[in-house]
Amino acid sequence: LRNQRKLGRFIADKAARHRFQSPLLWTTSPEQVHLLDHLEYDGLVYDCDRDWEELPPLWEGALANNADIVFAASPLLADRLAPCSSNVALLPNGVNFPLFSRPSDLSYDPLPQTTGPVLGWAGTIRPELDLEPLLYAARTMPRWTFVLLGPQGEGNSLLPRLRQLPNVVLPGGCPMAQVPDWLYRCDVLLDFLRDDRTCDDLVSCRMLEYLATGRPVVSMLWPDQIEPLPDVVYGAHSDQEFLTLCRHALDEPPNFAAQRRRSHAAAASWPLRCTQVVNILTTAGLL
């Protein structure tokens, strides 16, 4: 709590220096409930984009109860927060659609020596990321190339075994502007589960970035989970099904569902999300 008081003083000092008047406080984590007693504000927003099961439920309950508006990134999150607030609004994740929908410069090939199918994933390779399906597929299909683009965080237990496979590429991180080059180099894009995230109806920013490219997507699901976007995403429940659906995705006719995928992403573009936020806050009298 002492750190929260210190952070509260820091924020208050910055707000005073910039002559903030009637500020709208935007919070994104239940931990920030401890700042409320140390800040002056005229409106409070709680923007929830994940399940915070590792934090005390009372923190999130208090934050949602105090908030004038609660934004929830999925229907399940909205249902969970509804008992704590009568002003819960659904606000799904968004995407930089112009960046990811623009075809890559074909003169640049991030994998110039690679032939055959390329299947890729982009993001931080966290310890909680379940890469078992990738390991199974890479061992079974040695002529396919699998790319894990992104920083390796604190280390994933399967990385040592993946590094030993000649058909697994670990290029590390890159600037966001270069990520589309890698995605467009892939024939199929992949999404995996995280052991610390169990909210199964959340459409991630990564998924929206994938969809903006129009490329086929194969995603792992929890055992009882239903794919939220079944018309544009191949959803697998096991390592074997993951490999089978990767084969189906590679065999997908050109442009079979590319436009539907881009349409899903276009509907989640950040300008449209911002318009939704402005309309909701205006209706609530916060703007």
Indicate residue ranges for each PLM-predicted region:
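Carbohydrate-associated surface elements
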Residues: L76, G94, P103
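Conserved acidic donor-binding segment of nucleotide-sugar-dependent glycosyltransferases
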Residues: V232-Q240, H248-P254
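Membrane-proximal helix-turn-helix segments that form the acceptor-binding/catalytic region
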Residues: R9-K14, H38, D51-V70, L77-R80
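Nucleotide-activated donor-binding/catalytic signature segment of Leloir-type glycosyltransferases, i.e.
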Residues: G116, G150, N156-D181
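Nucleotide-sugar-dependent
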Residues: L129, A177-W182, L189-L211, S219-P228
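Nucleotide-sugar donor-binding and catalytic loop/hinge architecture
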Residues: R17-R19, S104-V118, T283
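Conserved donor-binding/catalytic core segment of Leloir-type glycosyltransferases
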Residues: L111-L129, L134-A138, V147-L149
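A charged, aromatic-enriched C-terminal amphipathic alpha-helix characteristic of glycosyltransferases
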Residues: P254-T283
